[in-house]
Regions:
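Hydrophobic cores of alpha-helical transmembrane segments in multi-pass integral membrane proteins
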Residues: 2-111, 119-247, 254, 261-350, ...
């Protein structure tokens, strides 16, 4: 079902180009489209009236600009409407529960009110997100091997949706909580490693769910959710060892409205690059399904090396926490590699066609490259404001340029030379390694203007 329906989707999209002109864009909107638009406008108006005193001019402009963007997204992909409604309702409920009878917010109620303590305070929601992403990954993988695989994959997909919703609720409530700590502490939750890992998790999952819906196949979820679960694993370790969930004031360099645009754009790029790499890995697994020679199974061994040697990278921090966490991480990583190795034939049967994997890989890289380009330009403008120059060859800037050049070359070869298949897949995997170093490795091993803390 996965391969046939997804391939038909590609063919249908190709055929649509030759059809005649239909009704105009707004003429195609129905009553539910317009109702969603009205609700978005009403919500933004309420937010402006309620919180405009705490906003500067740039933040007000962002709020106004977010209205047409949100309406368009809801019209473009209808499942986002339900997601937006659930996130808004849960976030407003949390804000209401924080209020005392005197009408003043009290963050101590997070330990006193049942719903806040166990479900929708920022930390509770993010912990639920973490558990549900793990469960989603497990169900997707069970779907690879079980006879009733479609049912397990459906459960994995639904759990991923709930996890995305809880991640957004946690982020929204954390934003509110930061403002209640102090007027100078409140900030959009994209300012430190903890917050951006939450951002990475839900953005990556949301983009994958879009591709899953568009191509009508859940066969890619097992691989994409692996990278989300890996990020969640790091997030939990970082939370426990570094107490990173605590809300801290921004360092001066981050007290800029450019951050509100630069960081989300950057992580759309990171998330979609990660999707492309995991689909490239799936492509190589499908390609080597019937291979028995060990040296031809290089993609599997590559995954094993990357996963199993990650504890060595964090060996200093692992020692601080007793090493037990990374020992478990090593064991789970080895189990995953072994499962893929011995079950590759069954996995290949459940994966979509090579054409679908290649097409989604290309589209994910194209989207990521567009947003990463925007983020790089915004970062240059931010640097000019913070440090007086658009470019200083700081290690972070240099590696961002390397990432940009890598994917620019990939897209150039795709569009000009028809790059596809094995070479494209390996290149996408290498691209993820480069991107990961640019994101984490630079902060760990190099120093520069972007070093705002240590792991």
């Amino acid at each position: 079902m996965n391969t046939a329906s997804a391939t038909q989707t590609i063919e249908l999209k190709k055929d649509q180009g030759g059809q005649g002109q239909g009704p105009g864009y707004f003429a195609r909107r129905n009553v539910w489209d317009w109702l969603f638009a009205v609700l978005v406008i009403a919500g933004a108006s309420w937010a402006f009236l309620r919180y405009n005193a705490a906003m500067d001019g740039y933040e007000k402009a962002i709020l106004v600009g977010a209205v047409p963007a949100m309406v368009w997204l809801g019209w473009f992909w209808r499942p986002l409407r339900a997601l937006a409604a659930v996130v808004a309702a849960a976030s407003l409920l949390a804000i209401w529960l924080y209020q005392t009878p005197a009408g003043v917010a009290d963050l101590a109620r997070a330990d006193q009110v049942f719903l806040l303590k166990y479900f929708i305070s920022s930390q509770s929601a993010i912990l639920w997100m973490s558990m549900l992403f793990f469960m989603s990954t497990a169900f997707y993988w069970m779907g690879m091997f079980k006879r009733a695989g479609d049912t397990f994959e459906l459960l994995g997909s639904r759990l991923a949706w709930v996890a995305v919703a809880l991640a957004l609720v946690g982020s929204m409530v954390r934003w509110y909580e930061s403002h209640q700590i102090g007027p100078d502490i409140g900030h959009i939750p994209v300012s430190n490693l903890y917050e951006v890992f939450v951002l990475f998790c839900w953005m990556t999952a949301a983009f994958y769910l879009y591709y899953e819906d568009q191509y009508r196949t859940r066969g890619m979820g097992a691989f994409v959710m692996l990278v989300v679960s890996a990020a969640v694993g790091f997030l939990l370790w970082y939370t426990v060892v570094r107490e990173a969930h605590a809300i801290q004031p921004l360092v001066p360099a981050l007290q800029s409205w450019w951050m509100k645009l630069h960081v989300p754009a950057n992580f759309i790029g990171y998330g979609t690059f990660a999707i492309a790499a995991m689909l490239a890995f799936a492509y190589l697994i499908k390609q080597s399904a019937s291979e028995s020679r060990w040296y031809k199974l290089a993609p599997l061994w590559l995954l094993g090396v990357v996963l199993c040697f990650e504890p060595i990278v964090f060996r200093q921090s692992a020692a601080e926490s007793g090493g037990s966490y990374w020992f478990v991480y090593f064991g789970i990583s080895a189990l995953i590699v072994g499962t893929i190795l011995f079950g590759r034939r069954r996995i290949a049967e459940r994966l979509p066609s090579f054409e679908v994997l290649d097409d989604v890989m290309y589209k994910a890289i194209a989207v990521g490259f567009a947003f990463f380009t925007i983020a790089t330009v915004l970062g240059a403008l931010w640097a000019a404001e913070a440090w007086g120059g658009y470019w200083s060859w700081d290690p972070k800037e240099t590696w961002a340029l390397i990432v940009w050049l890598n994917y620019a070359a990939w897209l150039h070869m795709r569009l000009m030379k028809g790059l596809r298949g094995t070479v494209a897949a390996w290149w996408a995997l290498v691209g993820l390694a480069v991107t990961t170093f640019a994101f984490l490795g630079v902060n760990m091993f190099l120093s520069g203007l972007h070093s705002y803390g240590e792991l």
